[in-house]
Amino acid sequence: MMIRYDELKVNDVVMFHGANVRIIKVTETPAPASEYYPNEKTIAFDIEPADEEAEKILGKFYSHDSYAGVGCLELELVKRDSQ
């Protein structure tokens, strides 16, 4: 199921680097000024691993426990698991 990035909410589960991750914070910020998209917004996500396998996968990319400010283009939408 395709979900628009601006529809993602806290507790949604999506894929990041092949790992299921849960969104824990959504931040909308103005994008850098652009003559083509002057009013464009950027959405950033703070995420956490959704399971043990995700922790192992993310450990290959990050040497810390904070996954803050992930860009929406890096997320692959796989499922919505709001609880």
Features from the language model and the residues they span:
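Short beta-strand-centered aromatic/proline hotspots
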Residues: 20-31
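Compositionally biased, low-complexity intrinsically disordered regions
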Residues: 19-21, 42, 73
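Mixed-charge, Lys/Arg-rich low-complexity intrinsically disordered regions
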Residues: 1-10
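Intrinsically disordered, low-complexity, charged/polar segments
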Residues: 48-83
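Short, solvent-exposed secondary-structure boundary/capping segments
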Residues: 30-44
